[in-house]
């Protein structure tokens, strides 16, 4: 975080945390550990980026040729989009690519969260386990998300999608970008899955760990102030709140508005 000189999760870091816990114990105060070096939570101060599990997103390009590098390609036949696996002699191809942002991790992948817990929560527990459920109340998570302002993706989506719905996610990805028959049904399937993966593979794992270690979890996601904002980042905050012992929301600045008069 800005201005921090102490190395995150270093021995010096935990020595200072220990001083805070000791003082809180004397004063009868609770301690809540912030689970990240800044925000958004989930990448252990950059440590998990070394594993290469970068956050992924989808990008559509309208191109003049079929691309073997695309995850899925489509052509427009009449009013319908049809998936193709080779050159079709068309003048326009709708090629969907998987892209990566190297500054954050894929929270839809359960293994990433397991690594996050091992790199963060377990270290605090190793140091302060005698105070968990006593002076140490729990952890605060800050703005975990699957991405922002782009369509989310993860390497776990193809298998999880087929398991949930019985068909290939690549058959309908164009429906996330273009309108056609069946688009609403596909979008419903896709976003329900993304919501479940985000909740279960990230927050539920943290929640279950906290339950098993005698502490609580609180915090918030991001863009809670509108449904549109939620879809960009977490596919809805209400399912997520089930796995926060103390649900939270972040409303920055003192400007309050509503959906009628934003």
Label each region the model flagged.
Residues 188, 192-196, 200, 222, ...:
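Active-site core of glycosidic bond-cleaving carbohydrate-active enzymes
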Residues 40-53, 144-158, 218-253:
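Substrate-binding cleft/loops of secretory-pathway carbohydrate-active enzymes
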Residues 89-110, 236-259:
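Aromatic- and acid-rich polysaccharide-binding/catalytic face
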Residues 28-32, 134-139, 207-209, 214-219, ...:
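Beta-sheet entry/capping signal
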Residues 22, 208, 239:
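Surface-exposed charge patches
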Residues 3-14, 223-230, 252-260:
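Acidic-and-aromatic substrate-binding clefts and catalytic sites of carbohydrate-active enzymes
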Residues 7-188, 195-202:
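Mature extracytoplasmic enzyme cores
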Residues 117-128, 229-240, 259-262:
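Short, acidic/polar
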């Amino acid at each position: 975080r800005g201005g921090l000189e102490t190395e995150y999760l270093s021995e010096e870091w935990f020595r200072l945390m220990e001083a805070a816990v000791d003082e809180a114990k004397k004063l009868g105060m609770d301690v809540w550990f912030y689970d990240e070096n800044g925000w958004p939570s989930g990448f252990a101060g950059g440590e998990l980026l070394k594993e290469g599990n970068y956050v992924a997103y989808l990008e559509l390009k309208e191109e003049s040729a079929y691309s073997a590098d695309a995850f899925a390609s489509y052509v427009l036949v009449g009013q319908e989009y049809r998936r193709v696996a080779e050159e079709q002699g068309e003048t326009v191809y709708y090629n969907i690519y998987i892209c990566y942002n190297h500054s954050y991790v894929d929270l839809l992948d359960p293994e990433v969260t397991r690594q996050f817990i091992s790199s963060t929560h377990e270290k605090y527990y190793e140091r302060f386990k005698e105070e968990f459920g006593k002076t140490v109340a729990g952890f605060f998570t800050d703005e975990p998300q699957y991405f922002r302002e782009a369509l989310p993706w993860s390497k776990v989506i193809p298998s999880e999608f087929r398991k949930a719905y019985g068909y290939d996610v690549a058959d309908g990805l164009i429906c996330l970008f273009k309108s056609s028959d069946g688009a609403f049904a596909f979008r419903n399937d896709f976003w329900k899955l993304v919501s479940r993966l985000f909740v279960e593979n990230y927050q539920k794992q943290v929640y279950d760990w906290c339950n098993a270690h005698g502490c609580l979890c609180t915090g918030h996601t991001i863009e809670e102030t509108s449904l549109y904002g939620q879809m960009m980042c977490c596919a809805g905050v209400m399912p997520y709140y089930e796995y926060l012992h103390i649900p939270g929301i972040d409303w920055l600045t003192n400007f309050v508005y509503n959906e009628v008069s934003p």
